[in-house]
Amino acid sequence: MFFGAFWLLLLLLLPPLRPPGAQGHRGAKSPEQEADEPIPWPSIQRLREQLRTAGTLSKRYWALFSCTLWPDHCEDQETPVPPLGWSLPLWGRRSLDMLTSWFCRFQDCCSAGNCRISNNFTGLESDLRVRLHGQHLASKLVLEAVKGYLEMPQVGKALALSFHGWSGTGKNFVARMLVDNLYRDGMRSDCVKMFISTFHFPHPKYVDLYKEDLQRQMQETQRRCQQSTFVFDEAEKLHPGLLELLEPYLEPRSPETHGAELPRAIFLLLSNLGGSVINEVVLGLLKAGWSREEITLQHLEMPLQAEIIKSADSSFGSSRLLKKHLIDLFIPFLPLEYRHVRLCVRDAFLGQDLPYTEEALDEIAKMMTYVPEEEQLFSSQGCKSISQRINLVLP
């Protein structure tokens, strides 16, 4: 096949062939002289014409393909592809559409970024089941809420999920896992924005500047993307003015106010607020003979919301987001036990492609502090800082 393609290319590149005995080139001929000369090697000439036609057709397909993927660049072409005098056949258009669809699975094909949205719910379900430990409740609630929202034919508001639990229980981990399965570029996607309260909005005196910048980013992202995700870490430390800014983005809206279809948006609010009451409820249920997997949202929802509302250390509980019930779901992250920490240690070894022993897993898991003092049941740091502790046991 390679040699066949080579000879076809050679035929296209060779100068016009002459029959034996013909004179070499001695200068330009007039059109009358060229017309009087017999056409040499008729069969080869016909083959060359067919190949040139095929080449022109290939160029036309490529032009249509590139214009489909990058319409902005298509308009800038200085030399348009010469027409063949007939329209592109239906089978050619279908082939072009199939090729475009396949290409867009791997490459960014549009300036809007929407062709990089994957919504891989199968991958999300697998990641939550395999990589997240001790959070059967959060796994179920996150998957059901996000999948249900994105599969709705039309939406009337943004989806607002509030993650609550102690540090190291997996709130950030789940947020990143979610983004990685909804967007091919993960956290690098133009449709994803992450804000850390103490990093992006550290000084209360600059709150007006923060509000202006935050509003600009959210508006630009929603204008660019039909599906956007906004992550707010340490949400309990957000300034009241910034919480108020989120209100119109989370309120229900009718399609008439925004055109035919509302852009979909997911807001994730990550907070340590309510972690203590979650731990108290879980500890009480375990002492009463319940298994961890039997704990449901009904056990935790009311105590968690009550704790958030009465918290004096944060303006989150007194914000209009809660008063107007704009948060769709409060998702509790349970405290992690020794067995869960041990699984996190194993994953950390595997993630760094390091060999491990059962003794090494136990050694690192025992380095963590466990509470309450009497029961020593829950890791006070969850699975945080485990990767750094691996270095302490390496030879």
From Swiss-Prot:
Glycan attachment points: 120
Range of residues in the leader sequence: 1-24
Annotated residues for binding of ATP: 165-172
Single GO MF descriptor: ATP hydrolysis activity
One cellular component term from this protein's GO annotations in UniProt: endoplasmic reticulum lumen
Annotated InterPro entries: ClpA/B, P-loop_NTPase, TOR1A_C, Torsin
Post-translational modification: N-glycosylated.
Protein's cellular compartments: Cytoplasm; Endoplasmic reticulum lumen
Chief place of localization: cytoplasm
Keywords: ATP-binding, Cytoplasm, Endoplasmic reticulum, Glycoprotein, Nucleotide-binding, Signal
Gene3D superfamilies: P-loop containing nucleotide triphosphate hydrolases
Similarity annotation: Belongs to the ClpA/ClpB family. Torsin subfamily.
Subunit (UniProt): May not form homohexamers.
Name listed for the protein in its UniProt record: Torsin-3A
Taxonomic classification: Eukaryota, Metazoa, Chordata, Craniata, Vertebrata
